[in-house]
Amino acid sequence: MALTVTWLPGLTHDWFTVPGKGNFSPSSLRNWLSLLTHVAGHSGWPHLVTNFSLILLIGPMLEESYGSLALLVMIVITALVTGILNVVFFTTGLMGASGVVFMMILLASFTNFSRGEIPLTFILVLVLYLGDQLLKSFGDGNISYFAHIAGGFCGSLFGFFIPPRRY
């Protein structure tokens, strides 16, 4: 689906982009659906390949650790959070799975840790990732670094409050 969406720019803009602040119409079913579907829309081939390569790399480990349903719920929540925040705070549209990717990156650091401890990998990834995203936020205006940060925040919360399955 994401490949088709990426190759059909009109479809991507109409159905797979969350409108920005002032452009979201509460009476539009398409706008409400875009709060979830924006993660399938991508600005081009490099954007799609980068996001889905990381999802394919990290996703199976998280699915094994948390289960398919729990991971799906985390993805849906992250999509909703990034979409809603974009509608509330930003005038530009939002598309792509980068928020989901960063949720997965930070969640992955929690897969093998003891409760009551903060994993060192989490601290390192958080510092490197957050620093990188904050620095980049002063550059290219076409990338929603805020969505990346919001996705990472979701992954951090999921990691702290949803324990991985133990076998």
Model-inferred region functions:
Residues 1-167:
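A detector for small-residue-rich transmembrane helices and their helix-helix packing motifs
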